[in-house]
Swiss-Prot record:
Protein task: Nucleotidase that shows phosphatase activity on nucleoside 5'-monophosphates.
InterPro entries: SurE (IPR030048), SurE-like_Pase/nucleotidase (IPR002828), SurE-like_sf (IPR036523)
Species this protein is from: Picosynechococcus sp. (strain ATCC 27264 / PCC 7002 / PR-6) (Agmenellum quadruplicatum)
Keywords: Cytoplasm, Hydrolase, Metal-binding, Nucleotide-binding
TM segment ranges: none
Protein name, as recorded: 5'-nucleotidase SurE
GO cellular component terms given for this protein: cytoplasm
Protein EC: 3.1.3.5
Reactions mediated catalytically: a ribonucleoside 5'-phosphate + H2O = a ribonucleoside + phosphate
Cellular location(s): Cytoplasm
Length: 277
């Protein structure tokens, strides 16, 4: 799908500069006619959340030979959030139209987003007032990122076409869309579903191990709890499924997120009490 107007796109991730997911996404968007700049960690940075690098230097370098020649790429020794901050402050001469993060190797559903470097890179774009998209392939075993990249191209076209309808109060307030794509052939996809954030938990275990020198270390492992009741959201109709539910039904999920985490119900309840110094 050729865009009516080529967009200026910044792409980052948390899987690192050599990851197939970001290479597939960046090259596909460049082939579609967009101006693409990649700034991402120089190594694996999964589950770093919204961490920043403080009190030590951040090193960067231009990367050649990995991406399509039309893509400008940088690697950064910092976190995904560092990468987006660096790109916006020191690399890009013009403000990007969108910040994209991914394609992550594995899902970012429900409460995963609190730990996700992928979502945090997109959240950094949102904090800077830029429309942002986090993309994840919801399968740790598959390396077929192309369907998710193709969907990103189509989604950007649709977002630009529908902009007057999804801009909040016609003020074009920035939006963050967290997108998860099932590992299914296109004809087997159930469709695209707007979802609310769900709940995801793991059976976690710290495995005690020993290194070759006999020193003890621990390795965190875990399995997803599949049958977990999903929470109700008083401000969202119940006919909106959670991202966890919709991905299980074979849908591409689009979950709008924000960085304001107020608990409105508790604010109202606690404000009715008399609190003493």
């Amino acid at each position: 799908m050729t865009p009516a107007t080529p967009l200026n796109l910044l792409i980052s991730n948390d899987d690192g500069i050599s990851a197939l997911g970001i290479r597939t996404l960046a090259n596909t968007l460049a082939e579609a006619g967009h101006q693409v700049t990649v700034v991402c960690p120089d190594r694996e940075r999964s589950a770093t959340g919204h961490g920043l690098t403080l009190h030590r230097p951040i090193r960067t370098e231009i990367v050649e030979g990995i991406f399509d020649p039309r893509v400008t790429a940088w690697s950064c020794s910092g976190t995904p959030s560092d990468c987006v901050k660096f790109a916006l402050s020191a690399v890009l001469k013009e403000r990007p139209d969108f910040v994209l993060s991914g394609i992550n190797h594995g899902s970012n559903l429900g409460t995963d987003v609190l730990y996700s470097g992928t979502v945090s890179a997109a959240m950094e774009g949102l904090l800077e007032g830029i429309h942002s998209i986090a993309l994840s392939l919801a399968d740790y075993t598959s390396h077929n990122f192309q369907p998710a990249a193709d969907f990103a191209v189509k989604l950007l076209c649709q977002l630009m076409e529908k902009r007057p309808h999804w801009a909040i109060a016609n003020q074009d307030a920035p939006v963050l869309l967290n997108i998860n794509v099932p590992n299914l052939e296109k004809e087997k996809l159930a469709g695209v579903k707007i979802t609310r954030q769900g709940l995801r938990r793991y059976i976690e275990q710290f495995q005690k191990r020993q290194d070759p020198r006999g020193k003890t270390y621990y390795w965190l492992s875990g399995e997803v709890i599949e049958e977990l009741p999903q929470p109700d959201e008083p401000n969202i109709p119940l006919d909106f499924p959670t991202d966890v539910q919709a991905i299980a039904a074979g849908y591409i999920t689009i979950t709008p997120l924000q960085y304001i985490m107020n608990d409105l119900h508790r604010i109202q309840t606690l404000a009715q009490e008399d609190w003493q110094i």
